[in-house]
From Swiss-Prot:
Coiled coil residues, start to end: none
Cell compartment(s), UniProt: Cytoplasm
Keywords: Aminopeptidase, Cytoplasm, Hydrolase, Metal-binding, Metalloprotease, Protease, Zinc
GO MF: aminopeptidase activity; metallopeptidase activity; zinc ion binding
Family to which this protein belongs: Belongs to the MtfA family.
Name of the protein: Mlc titration factor A
Cofactor note: Binds 1 zinc ion per subunit.
Enzyme Commission code(s) on record: 3.4.11.-
Keyword NADP in record: no
Amino acids binding Zn(2+): H111, H148, H152, E211
Provenance organism: Escherichia coli O7:K1 (strain IAI39 / ExPEC)
Function summary: Involved in the modulation of the activity of the glucose-phosphotransferase system (glucose-PTS). Interacts with the transcriptional repressor Mlc, preventing its interaction with DNA and leading to the modulation of expression of genes regulated by Mlc, including ptsG, which encodes the PTS system glucose-specific EIICB component.
Keyword Zinc on entry: yes
Amino acid sequence: MIKWPWKVQESAHQTALPWQEALSIPLLTCLTEQEQSKLVALAERFLQQKRLVPLQGFELNSLRSCRIALLFCLPVLELGLEWLDGFHEILIYPAPFVVDDEWEDDIGLVHNQRIVQSGQSWQQGPIVLNWLDIQDSFDASGFNLIIHEVAHKLDTRNGDRASGVPFISLREVAGWEHDLHAAMNNIQEEIELVGENAASIDAYAASDPAECFAVLSEYFFSAPELFAPRFPSLWQRFCQFYQQDPLQRLHHANDTDSFSATNVH
């Protein structure tokens, strides 16, 4: 059994958090032991700095808290926890929730409607999530609610609103915008050809640049084999920004599994 270095109690009365069990979700199994250790260290600090607030009867236990923290910290594994500054609370509903939405049309009329949301992220406010979709974020399917909302937070570090361009050097902005819009157009063309439900990338990515960055961040971490070959130039930009290469990580994990299987006697 691995003796995890993070299992250090803050006091004699505190029970060690179940980090090893929390790491057992499919999304995190490709991480090396060194990466897992680094991720847990970030997640421990995350839980010290942020407040998880269960709503509408949702029950939050230590395992759920650990897994939520791990998913929040995965995108900033190499960037650093300071990239998640600017909010202090995560509100968690048991299921998708209803909100009042107000929007203005092209002629200036203001409309109000109630819509169902999976999550929300405010620039200087809390992140709102729901547990059903968090659970669906544990696998490697291309869907990850927490990474989506974290991407919006990373996006807004570059200005007053999410633009689809995170905080990168000015000389890289034009190339980023070009590749992101090319990806949006490609996704839209597929939608027009096969329909939203049959599209290989979530159709929400074609709605605007901010959502494209957030959706493709989900695929970057949880389905790199779909993202990388389809948008290779944009993939390299994501690798450079996040300072991670999930596809290389996946290939290494698969090679390790294959080697282990061939050496079983």
